[in-house]
Amino acid sequence: SVCEDTASVTMVANQSGGTWSGNGIDATSGLYTVSNVGNYTFTYTYGTGTCLVTDQVTLTVNALPVVGAGNDVSYCVDAGLQTMVGSPSGGTWTGLGITNGSSGIFDPDVAGAGIHTIVYSYVDGNSCENSDTVLVTVNGLPYVDAGLDTNLCNQPISVTLSGSPANGIWIGSGITLGGVYTPNGVGTT
């Protein structure tokens, strides 16, 4: 048997010099160009007259397995290890950022920022292999600058902090999301 992605098969008889017959096979060379999934019977004829003998062989053309690598995905470079899921299970993952091909572990930090083509390959019980790809976009972290350290007096006077890029969100004790801070005691915040 062969897989449907096989270009051609040359049938070989034990005794050369005979003739092949059957749908699509070359009579002299025994070359059959694979076109469709199914069973194909070919006859080999050798000899002449009362010494004419024939034999048949069946070639099975197996379909490729249907393989899915999933939908395209995006991760931040610091997202940590991600598990890719393909179907059917039991295949192998390859590509930049894959750190364990059999379990589909993808590390965005290893891949780095950019768009990466990841391949999932699967071999079925007929030894037919097929694959699918998924695009994984790894986004780099934005540059963020909270500005210079600032010394304030312990007075209830609000100060608006500024960072770059603008329109970020501030998080901390005594500060609003918009960056307004009112001192409330001595110390470092």
Language-model-derived ranges and their functions:
Residues 1-189:
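Proline- and Ser/Thr-rich low-complexity, intrinsically disordered segments
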